[in-house]
Amino acid sequence: MNCLIIDDEPLARIGMERLIRQYSHLKVLGTFRNAIGVADFLKDNEVDLLFLDIEMPGVNGLELARTLPEHTLVIFTTAYSQYALES
Protein backbone atom coordinates (compact mmCIF):
# COMPACT_ATOMS: atom_id res chain seq x y z
CA MET A 1 0.00 0.00 0.00
CA ASN A 2 1.55 3.29 -1.12
CA CYS A 3 1.44 6.06 1.48
CA LEU A 4 2.10 9.78 1.84
CA ILE A 5 2.74 11.69 5.04
CA ILE A 6 1.60 15.32 5.14
CA ASP A 7 2.35 17.21 8.35
CA ASP A 8 3.86 20.61 9.08
CA GLU A 9 5.71 19.34 12.17
CA PRO A 10 9.09 17.79 11.24
CA LEU A 11 9.20 15.48 14.28
CA ALA A 12 5.70 14.18 13.49
CA ARG A 13 6.73 13.38 9.90
CA ILE A 14 9.89 11.62 11.05
CA GLY A 15 8.06 9.62 13.72
CA MET A 16 5.27 8.54 11.40
CA GLU A 17 7.70 7.54 8.69
CA ARG A 18 9.73 5.42 11.12
CA LEU A 19 6.58 3.73 12.39
CA ILE A 20 5.15 3.07 8.93
CA ARG A 21 8.43 1.62 7.63
CA GLN A 22 8.11 -1.16 10.23
CA TYR A 23 5.23 -2.63 8.20
CA SER A 24 6.34 -4.36 5.01
CA HIS A 25 2.96 -3.91 3.30
CA LEU A 26 3.20 -0.09 3.63
CA LYS A 27 5.53 1.95 1.42
CA VAL A 28 6.15 5.65 2.08
CA LEU A 29 6.36 7.35 -1.31
CA GLY A 30 7.04 10.78 0.15
CA THR A 31 6.51 13.33 2.88
CA PHE A 32 5.20 16.88 2.61
CA ARG A 33 5.25 19.72 5.15
CA ASN A 34 2.04 21.22 3.71
CA ALA A 35 -0.60 20.63 1.04
CA ILE A 36 1.36 22.46 -1.65
CA GLY A 37 2.48 20.00 -4.29
CA VAL A 38 0.37 17.10 -3.05
CA ALA A 39 -2.21 17.37 -5.87
CA ASP A 40 0.52 17.24 -8.51
CA PHE A 41 2.19 14.30 -6.76
CA LEU A 42 -1.11 12.41 -6.70
CA LYS A 43 -1.59 12.96 -10.45
CA ASP A 44 1.76 11.30 -11.16
CA ASN A 45 1.79 8.59 -8.48
CA GLU A 46 -0.61 5.92 -7.27
CA VAL A 47 -1.21 6.63 -3.59
CA ASP A 48 -3.54 4.46 -1.53
CA LEU A 49 -3.28 6.05 1.91
CA LEU A 50 -2.53 9.51 3.30
CA PHE A 51 -1.46 10.25 6.85
CA LEU A 52 -2.77 13.80 6.92
CA ASP A 53 -2.36 16.50 9.54
CA ILE A 54 -5.44 18.69 9.90
CA GLU A 55 -3.97 21.95 11.20
CA MET A 56 -1.41 23.23 8.70
CA PRO A 57 -0.66 26.68 7.30
CA GLY A 58 -2.38 27.52 4.03
CA VAL A 59 -4.66 24.67 2.98
CA ASN A 60 -5.56 22.55 6.01
CA GLY A 61 -5.92 18.78 5.93
CA LEU A 62 -9.72 18.79 5.87
CA GLU A 63 -9.73 21.05 2.82
CA LEU A 64 -7.16 18.86 1.09
CA ALA A 65 -9.11 15.68 1.88
CA ARG A 66 -12.18 17.07 0.11
CA THR A 67 -10.19 17.27 -3.14
CA LEU A 68 -8.81 13.72 -3.07
CA PRO A 69 -10.02 10.91 -5.32
CA GLU A 70 -12.68 8.82 -3.56
CA HIS A 71 -10.52 5.69 -3.50
CA THR A 72 -7.77 7.41 -1.48
CA LEU A 73 -7.87 6.44 2.19
CA VAL A 74 -7.04 9.07 4.80
CA ILE A 75 -5.89 8.77 8.38
CA PHE A 76 -6.10 12.20 9.99
CA THR A 77 -3.43 13.13 12.49
CA THR A 78 -3.84 16.09 14.81
CA ALA A 79 -2.95 17.38 18.23
CA TYR A 80 -6.25 19.29 18.43
CA SER A 81 -9.26 17.47 19.89
CA GLN A 82 -11.76 19.94 18.37
CA TYR A 83 -11.15 18.35 14.95
CA ALA A 84 -12.14 14.84 16.01
CA LEU A 85 -15.77 15.01 14.92
CA GLU A 86 -15.19 16.96 11.71
CA SER A 87 -12.47 14.62 10.48
Each model region followed by its residue ranges:
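Extreme N-terminal starter segment of soluble prokaryotic enzymes
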Residues: 1-3
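Conserved sequence signature across two-component system core domains
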Residues: 6-7, 32, 50, 77
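The feature encodes the CheY-like receiver
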Residues: 12, 21, 57
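Charged phosphotransfer/docking patches of two-component systems
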Residues: 12-14, 84
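Alpha-helical interaction/dimerization surfaces of two-component signaling modules
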Residues: 18-23, 41
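A generic structural motif
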Residues: 23-29
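Conserved Asp/Asn-Gly motif in the active-site loop of CheY-like receiver
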Residues: 29-38
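CheY-like receiver
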Residues: 40-41, 45-87
